Amino acid sequence: MFHPRFALLVLVFALSPLWGAHPQSSHDIWTHSNPADMGLSETKLRAMSVAARSADFKKIGSILIARHGKLVYEDYLEGDANTLRDTRSATKTVTDILVGMAIDEGKLSGVNAKVLSLLPDRARRLQNPDPRKFAMTIEDLLTMSSPLECDDWNDASRGNEERMYVVEDWSQFILNLPIRGRMHLGETIEPPPYGRYFSYCTGGVFVLSEVLQKATGARVDHYAREKLFLPLGITNVQWVYSPLNIPQTGGGLRLSSRDLLKIGQLYQNGGRWGARQVVTEAWVRNSTHPHARIDETTDYGYLWWLKSFRAGSKSYPAYFMSGNGGNKVVAIPQLDLVAVITSTNFNAPAMHQQTDKILTDYILASVEQ
């Protein structure tokens, strides 16, 4: 006969290794600590592990937490520490880091560099030419505020990413788009905060792949490996490529949960990893500063999302990577905390709400000091 007490013992045994010793590869340089030593409630984290496996949450893949630079919690509901996670657009943020590095190295003159000036072959084949296209900058693409008629959140948009995927030349497809309108039924729209009109455009971020290759002389996947991934001890990645074999910088890059956590921690450290300044602190600050308004609660930096998360009576400003399915890598400077939540709950109506609930009701609620 199955006894409830035995079920409880099994559950406790299953959950206890979450903050114990974990297998590490020679490239995984995380230092581990107990949650309690880092000011987190182990009781609350155990409750989170139970809840994440309940019917209240769908297809959660992993949950990891770093506090004060140490890995204090990891839980794998799908796969393990070596599983490469399909976090979709969350990895757009990697493109921000690579652009910052190219600027730091003098390969790019800065965020005001004109995109079509860097891609003269593309400019010569341009359809729907317009002075506003030739004035389009790297910053316009980093902030989802280019003049192109491209909106992934609008099925009718000519630049919707699903239309891009069915053609061979993604970059030319995007650059050939007409200029988007900002008038509705003859009514003027008030200038937005920060002076930029936000329109979520994966294709614009993909164009940065060619911009980076032109500037650095290296294909983006090779540049990322040498300049970003190896310094962080990241050795196992999986890129998506366009039909012309150009790395997709607009999302789809697969990394392990621990390696995603490293990217969040890199920015939490002001661009430093160990003794090495991987990307300048100035770039980190500018990337995570608001440049465009998405809605009344959310701003956008350079391919980073910005909003405050509330736990109880407290509100914590955060910047985060975000992707379809509810995938998130969240940094909360006030708490010196970074969290990774991966999920395969793709295209579900409440995909982001459920990962936000894990963050607010459990991770932030676990903070005791």
Report the location of each language-model feature:
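Structured C-terminal helix/loop/strand segments within mature extracytoplasmic catalytic/sensor domains
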Residues: 321-369
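Short, well-structured active-site flanking segments
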Residues: 74, 101-121, 216-240, 274-281
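Active-site-adjacent helix/loop patches that line small-molecule binding or acyl-intermediate pockets
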Residues: 117, 128-234, 257-266, 271
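Short, small/polar residue-rich loop motifs at catalytic or cofactor-binding pockets
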Residues: 57-60, 83-84, 324-326
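Active-site SXXK
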Residues: 46, 69, 86-112, 141, ...
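Active-site Gly/Thr loop motif
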Residues: 234-237, 284-338
